[in-house]
């Protein structure tokens, strides 16, 4: 809950990456090198949005609690109470998962 003390500004989105799977469905343990980079995350905080040329606030495309797909590279690492979070621009998020 450390992210509750951090409020992203403008069109920034704070996410917590999901853990990589360490065991296959068949029960085989995967070494770290073969796990791959985690590209899925849960949104934990969003900024109010960015301003357009008319001075109106553009609404964010994601909400807190949604699962999103991240780009392979990018984002700013933020450490809050010994836990890693990542800060992305709203436009950098590739998509969101729908239940």
Curated annotation (Swiss-Prot):
Q: Which GO terms describe its biological process?
A: chaperone cofactor-dependent protein refolding
Q: Which UniProt keywords apply?
A: Chaperone, Mitochondrion
Is Transmembrane helix a UniProt keyword of this protein?
no
Q: Could you tell me which SMART domains the record lists for this protein?
A: Cpn10 (SM00883)
Localization, UniProt: Mitochondrion matrix
One function term, GO molecular function aspect: unfolded protein binding
Cellular component, GO, one term: mitochondrial matrix
- PANTHER family, alphabetized: 10 KDA HEAT SHOCK PROTEIN, 10 KDA HEAT SHOCK PROTEIN, MITOCHONDRIAL
Spell out the family assignment given in the record's similarity comment. Belongs to the GroES chaperonin family.
Record-linked HAMAP family: CH10
Task: List the protein's name.
Answer: 10 kDa heat shock protein, mitochondrial
